[in-house]
Amino acid sequence: MSDTQKRIDDLVKSSEVLLFMKGTASFPQCGFSGRAIQILKACGVDPKAVVTVNVLEDDAIRQGIKEYSHWPTIPQLYVKGEFIGGSDIMMEMYESGELQQLLGTAE
């Protein structure tokens, strides 16, 4: 495992809710990353509880996360160490209520 893959693995395993995104939660740099943040907010997740990684600040992470997850696009959501998907999958799961259950925010 490369140093980059180890860094990613450590982040995934140590974070309850982790989002690899372009930009930051307060200033997303792409529409899909912004949508991912909005979905998490709509689920009732405290923004401070979400660990975000701005892949635009680290090219090794930006490329490495795609290899780590075998998923070609960003954003990427991980919950309790498990890869969930990108913003389209997040939206589908939100609409079905599955994402809220996974995050423990279901009413």
Label for each model-derived stretch:
Residues 1-4, 107:
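N-terminal organelle transit peptides
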Residues 6, 62-64:
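TIR-domain catalytic/interaction hotspot
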Residues 9-47:
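Local sequence-structure signature of Cys/Sec-based thiol-disulfide redox active-site neighborhoods
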Residues 20, 76-80:
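Acidic beta-strand-to-loop metal/phosphate-binding motif
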Residues 45-62:
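Thiol-based oxidoreductase modules, predominantly thioredoxin-like and allied folds used
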Residues 67-73:
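Thiol/disulfide oxidoreductase modules built on the thioredoxin-like
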Residues 79-107:
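Non-catalytic, surface beta->alpha helical segment in thiol-disulfide oxidoreductase systems
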